[in-house]
Amino acid sequence: MSIDGRIAMKNGESRWITSKESREDVQKFRAKSSAILTSSATILNDDPLLNVRYKKFDKNTLSTFPKKIFQQPIRIIIDSKNRVKKSHKIIQTKEKILLMRLKLDKEIWPENTKQIIIKPYKENIDLLCVLKFLGNLEINNLWIEAGSTLSGCFLKLELIDEIIIYIAPKILGHEAKPLFIFNNQLKLFDCLKFDFKDIRQIGPDIRIKLEPKNKKF
């Protein structure tokens, strides 16, 4: 994100705010994860693959993730309105994908893609039920890469145990999209509080790790 807390321009343009070094660092966190979770909005806006670029790892990183035991993370997409289609790039990859939905569609999906029905919460997908479902699959290290709305929902529901932010030395202005969006306004007394756990420079950017003060996990 930018130093004024923005992750994309008003028109959705976001490539690239952070540096190549930061994007390479993200690959390591993806590789450590059992699964990567995103929203249908991110799929529609960016059409990402959300996999690990294993072939681009340097020797030191490859030693951490030996090819014999490395597995691509499962990709999980929160898709309450069935907006993800077979034409999206992520569906055309071979690794496993779970579409979290409120109802099935009539598409014939590739073998790697499964629709999972999750009960609703206020007309949206119940995120706590999603996490419980993933826990039953022994997915215990979940990496979330999503936009302002879904990320804000996870934070507001206190379902996050760590935040990792990459800050680029850029300013995008007040019309650009913020890092988090909450549906209801918080009073200062009720604001979400965090502890800094690690701060370091990654290329020209800064990476910050934070944990909630009242961590539940």
From Swiss-Prot:
Q: In which pathway does it act?
A: Cofactor biosynthesis; riboflavin biosynthesis; 5-amino-6-(D-ribitylamino)uracil from GTP: step 3/4
Q: Where does substrate bind?
A: 14, 30, 50, 53, 145
**Per the record, what are the reactions this protein catalyses?**
5-amino-6-(5-phospho-D-ribitylamino)uracil + NADP(+) = 5-amino-6-(5-phospho-D-ribosylamino)uracil + NADPH + H(+)
The record's annotation in InterPro entries points to: DHFR-like_dom_sf, Eubact_RibD, RibD_C, RibDG_C, Riboflavin_Biosynth_HTPR
Which ranges of the sequence are coiled-coil? Answer: none
Q: Which UniProt keywords apply?
A: NADP, Oxidoreductase, Riboflavin biosynthesis
Enzyme Commission numbers on file: 1.1.1.193
Residues that, per the record, bind NADP(+): 16, 46, 80
- The reply to whether NADP figures as a keyword in the UniProt entry is yes
Q: Name one GO biological process term.
A: riboflavin biosynthetic process
A Gene Ontology molecular function term of the record: 5-amino-6-(5-phosphoribosylamino)uracil reductase activity
| SUPFAM superfamilies tied to this protein | Dihydrofolate reductase-like
- Enzyme's top EC category: oxidoreductase
In the UniProt record, does the keyword Oxidoreductase occur? Answer: yes
Q: Which family does it belong to?
A: Belongs to the HTP reductase family.
For this entry, the protein name equals 5-amino-6-(5-phosphoribosylamino)uracil reductase
Species source reads: Buchnera aphidicola subsp. Schizaphis graminum (strain Sg)
Q: Which gene encodes it?
A: ribD2
